[in-house]
Amino acid sequence: MRVADFHFELPESLIARHPLAERRASRLLVLDGVTGDLQHRRFADLLDHLRPGDLMVFNNTRVIPARLFGWKASGGKLEILVERVLDDERVLAHVRASKSPKAGSRILIEGGGEAQMLARHDALFELRFDQRVLPLLERVGHMPLPPYIDRPDEAADRERYQTVYAARAGAVAAPTAGLHFDEALLAAIGEKDVATAFVTLHVGAGTFQPVRVERIEDHHMHREWLEVGQEVVDAVAACRARGGRVVAVGTTSVRSLESAARDGVLRPFSGDTDIFIYPGRPFHVVDALVTNFHLPESTLLMLVSAFAGYPETMAAYAAAVAQGYRFFSYGDAMFITRNPAPRAPEETP
């Protein structure tokens, strides 16, 4: 399959650069995976598409204010984007500067604090701070808005680029499908006898990296840490026993569940994943998906195409563009039921 098969034209005006005033005020494009039919709804209408006995699986990662500004002790400004917290004081980070810092060099942090560059690991720098990392980031860090939100972060982003159920700090990008849920909607979901469970996948900056090969099969995914606990495995088993559907909230929840069931059996899992889901790969756990609209030629669009079918997905995206849906992290959402016989690009007439 060619990466170019997943291209579509997107007007700049449809990229959402700010969230709506209310989380569930977004639009919802419903795609029936069996028939390919589309419905244009509001996100609050998601309740109409859930059934008693279903299980919704959320990603409870918490976005850290991972972007720091500073300068080398020897002179020269730089920008740090923390990719992964290794321990209380060490991180792996992207460093943008006119000249990369060398091992042993000191970095002064705007707002207070400093770090030492310990080693370079390919594109990432291992840094050690002079204090605990997470409190430092909370104090002087900036929310790591995606590159397509071309504005400085604002105070409101601390709340809105975060799900209301975020619990475990470590992500440098939000699991954006979850941004549409507020406390009232979550309560209404529970009142409908829809169960909930939580996985953790700390979304890395690699989620925004373009695919740099021509053929999908040649692409290697970035690694991200996740955890699927025994309670999630038990919740899925109980859902199956009562005839419910497993509804993944976001592609990160899909990748978590399917990583923990690579051999077809869902088991507890904690560790790194580099799972790459594209057309032709089977799904062992997920029956329905809540997701935002993704970038052209992105691995996340490929995942959605694997789930809903390539022609159905691209037709839905064309309809979304024509209807003026808002795209990407602060944009609108889709609710998709799994296509039992999804077609890949080569199979499309």
Swiss-Prot record:
User: A single GO CC term, please?
Assistant: cytoplasm
The record's top EC class is transferase
Catalytic activity annotated for this protein? 7-aminomethyl-7-carbaguanosine(34) in tRNA + S-adenosyl-L-methionine = epoxyqueuosine(34) in tRNA + adenine + L-methionine + 2 H(+)
Key word Transcription regulation present in the record? no
Gene3D superfamilies linked to this entry? QueA-like (3.40.1780.10)
In what pathway does it function? tRNA modification; tRNA-queuosine biosynthesis
Q: Tell me the keywords, alphabetical order.
A: Cytoplasm, Queuosine biosynthesis, S-adenosyl-L-methionine, Transferase
Keyword S-adenosyl-L-methionine among UniProt keywords:
yes
Q: Where are the transmembrane segments?
A: none
Pfam families registered for this protein in UniProt: Queuosine_synth
Q: Which GO terms describe its biological process?
A: queuosine biosynthetic process; tRNA wobble guanine modification
Q: What subcellular compartments does it reside in?
A: Cytoplasm
Task: Name the Gene Ontology molecular function terms of this record.
Answer: S-adenosylmethionine:tRNA ribosyltransferase-isomerase activity
The protein's superkingdom reads Bacteria
Task: Provide the assembly information.
Answer: Monomer.
Family in the record: Belongs to the QueA family.
Q: What does this protein do?
A: Transfers and isomerizes the ribose moiety from AdoMet to the 7-aminomethyl group of 7-deazaguanine (preQ1-tRNA) to give epoxyqueuosine (oQ-tRNA).
Official protein name in the record: S-adenosylmethionine:tRNA ribosyltransferase-isomerase
Query: Organism, per UniProt?
Result: Azotobacter vinelandii (strain DJ / ATCC BAA-1303)
What does the record give as the organism's lineage?
A: Bacteria, Pseudomonadati, Pseudomonadota, Gammaproteobacteria, Pseudomonadales
Please state the gene responsible for encoding this protein.
queA
